[in-house]
Amino acid sequence: RRLRIDNTSLSIFNLSPGTNGPQVQIECLNSTTHLQPLPDKGKGARMILVRHGETDWNKAGRFQGQIDIPLNEHGRSQAAAARDALSTIPIDRAWSSTLSRPTETAEIILSDHPGVPLLQIDGLVEIGHGLWEGKLESEIRADWAELLEQWKQEPETVKMPDGETIQDVWARSVKSWKKIASSLR
């Protein structure tokens, strides 16, 4: 099976119980042609991660972060392509951040899976870019050239002005993923 969705990410993780915690198999990162055939799913869960479709700010190169920018038409067509790719895959639960772009992406995908609940989780929102949100890279460079270069080279060392660090995002998202994982048992 080959899955490729323009400018979108679709990843599949198979989780199964292990003696030292869950065992994870990565099934797909847009193309599975390089992988060996999968064994039967067996016990455990399969998680499909889909990045939201394009927005006008993505297209323009603006830092979005936590500003709630909706999908554009191309983003909706990307979500429809993900829906089509996943139409025959059984889905029994779905999660999204509380922002409209991932929520709409999920709703479009779930239109082929009626009755599947979509739970929104605050902790899954994107990194808060603070004062950089809504700005083009050239605008950020004008005021924060050194910090922008550091962000490109070592993002884990940067706290954007009035924004979050990678560690902040990690802490809140891990809590959310643990909540999701515990609901799969």
Where are these predicted regions, by residue range?
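Short, intrinsically disordered, charge-balanced linker/junction segments flanking boundaries
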Residues: 183-185
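Helix-turn-helix-type domain boundary/helix-start signal
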Residues: 3, 69, 158-159
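Phosphate-coordination/substrate-recognition cap region in phosphate-metabolizing enzymes
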Residues: 5, 11, 21-23, 80-149, ...
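Short, solvent-exposed loop/turn segments at secondary-structure junctions
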Residues: 18, 32-34, 54-56, 100-101, ...
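Acidic, low-complexity terminal tails and accessory targeting/binding regions
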Residues: 2-49, 130-139
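Active-site-proximal alpha-helix that buttresses catalytic centers in soluble enzyme cores
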Residues: 42-116, 143, 164-173
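A short acidic, helix-capping loop that chelates divalent metal ions and anchors anionic groups
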Residues: 58-59, 127-132, 157-161
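Short glycine/proline- and acidic residue-enriched helix-loop micro-motifs
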Residues: 147-168
